[in-house]
Amino acid sequence: MNKDEILKEFGRNLKAERNRAGYSQDGLALKTGICAGKHIGKIERGETNPSLYTIISIMDVLNISFDKLYKK
């Protein structure tokens, strides 16, 4: 997999987990306190590479482990 494919897969999985948890993009952004809802959208579309801190903050709010976001 190349970088773009990894980011798109990560984004699709993030969107699925966010929806499962019942958060909107804005709601997740507010709960993490780290970014705006449109930034969550960019992550979900694979348009940006989130920092490790952002990923960990999202995982904490959604109460998930990394393997839910990236499945090899």
Question: What function would you assign to each model-found segment?
Answer:
Residues 1-20:
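A short, Lys/Arg-rich alpha-helix, primarily the initiator
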Residues 51-68:
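DNA major-groove recognition helix of helix-turn-helix/homeodomain DNA-binding modules
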Residues 43-44, 54:
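DNA major-groove recognition helix of helix-turn-helix
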Residues 12, 37, 52-56:
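Short alpha-helical elements of helix-turn-helix
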